[in-house]
Structures are given as structure tokens and as C-alpha cells.
């Protein structure tokens, strides 16, 4: 029966390690998401700033090559913003998966804890039962030994 105790403790330790890995993974994903969101806001700010500059330059008169440069830069910013938004969505999906896995591992850990506690209670009952049987046998032998003295 000792092997059951070892199995439960091994399974419990495995789940604890899985939970720790999940927590680290979730923290990293949150940090990545935060980084992407700040990048996105910076890119949008740059885009708005350059759109305002381009508008004012157009009103004042702008050379064709300057207009192309501004337009190309704003176009590149547009694609960078779209790419960053896709990264945020992908990160969010991975984060949701990781949170689900974390909750599954928590449930497994609670299950192993419950089964281990149930096993311990059962083992304690067995030990108490054996002790009670030994005590009963001892008292029976003691009574028989005392009774045999009177029969002689």
C-alpha cells in the first residue's frame, strides 16, 4: 500500500510543476501582450502625427518626392499596425488556452489531493482496526489466563 502513497505524491508533484509552468507561461504572455499594446499605441501615435504633418504640408504646398516619402512611411505604419493587432489577437488566443490549461491542472491537483486524503483516512482506519483487534486479542488472552488460574 505504500506504493499508492508514492504514486499520489508523484502525481501531485507533477501537477504542481505543471501549474508552475503554466503560471510562468501566463505571466510571459501578459508581458508580451502589454508590450504589443504599447507598441500599437506608439505606432498609431506616429501615424496620426505624420498624417497631421502631411496634411499641413499639403496645405502649404509639398514636393512630389516629399509626398511620396510621407505616404510610403504612413503606408508602412499602417501595415505595422495591422501586424501588431494580429499579434495581439494571436497572443490573446494563446493566453486563453493557457488559462484553460491552468484551470485543468488546478482541478487535477485538487483531485490528487482529495484522493490522497481519502487514502490516508482509509489507511488510518486500517491501522486503528488492527490496533483494536490486537487489543481485543490481548484482553481475551489476559482473561483466559486469569480464568485458567481459577479452574485449577
Swiss-Prot record:
Record keyword Membrane present: yes
Subcellular location: Cell membrane
Keywords assigned by UniProt, alphabetized: Bacterial flagellum biogenesis, Bacterial flagellum protein export, Cell membrane, Chemotaxis, Membrane, Protein transport, Transport
GO biological process: bacterial-type flagellum organization; bacterial-type flagellum-dependent cell motility; chemotaxis; protein transport
GO CC terms, sorted: bacterial-type flagellum; plasma membrane
Family stated for the protein in its record: Belongs to the FliJ family.
Name of the protein: Flagellar FliJ protein
Species assigned in the record: Buchnera aphidicola subsp. Schizaphis graminum (strain Sg)
Amino acid at each position: 500500500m505504500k506504493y499508492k502513497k508514492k504514486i499520489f505524491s508523484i502525481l501531485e508533484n507533477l501537477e504542481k510543476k505543471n501549474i508552475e509552468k503554466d503560471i510562468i507561461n501566463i505571466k510571459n504572455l501578459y508581458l508580451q501582450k502589454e508590450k504589443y499594446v504599447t507598441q500599437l499605441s506608439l505606432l498609431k501615435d506616429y501615424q496620426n502625427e505624420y498624417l497631421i504633418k502631411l496634411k499641413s504640408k499639403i496645405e502649404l504646398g509639398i514636393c512630389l518626392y516629399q509626398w511620396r516619402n510621407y505616404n510610403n512611411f504612413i503606408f508602412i505604419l499602417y501595415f505595422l499596425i495591422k501586424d501588431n493587432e494580429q499579434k495581439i489577437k494571436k497572443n490573446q488566443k494563446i493566453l486563453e488556452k493557457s488559462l484553460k490549461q491552468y484551470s485543468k491542472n488546478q482541478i487535477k491537483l485538487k483531485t490528487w489531493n482529495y484522493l490522497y486524503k481519502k487514502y490516508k483516512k482509509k489507511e488510518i482506519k486500517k491501522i486503528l482496526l488492527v490496533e483494536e483487534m490486537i487489543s481485543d486479542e490481548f484482553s481475551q488472552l489476559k482473561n483466559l489466563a486469569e480464568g485458567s488460574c481459577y479452574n485449577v
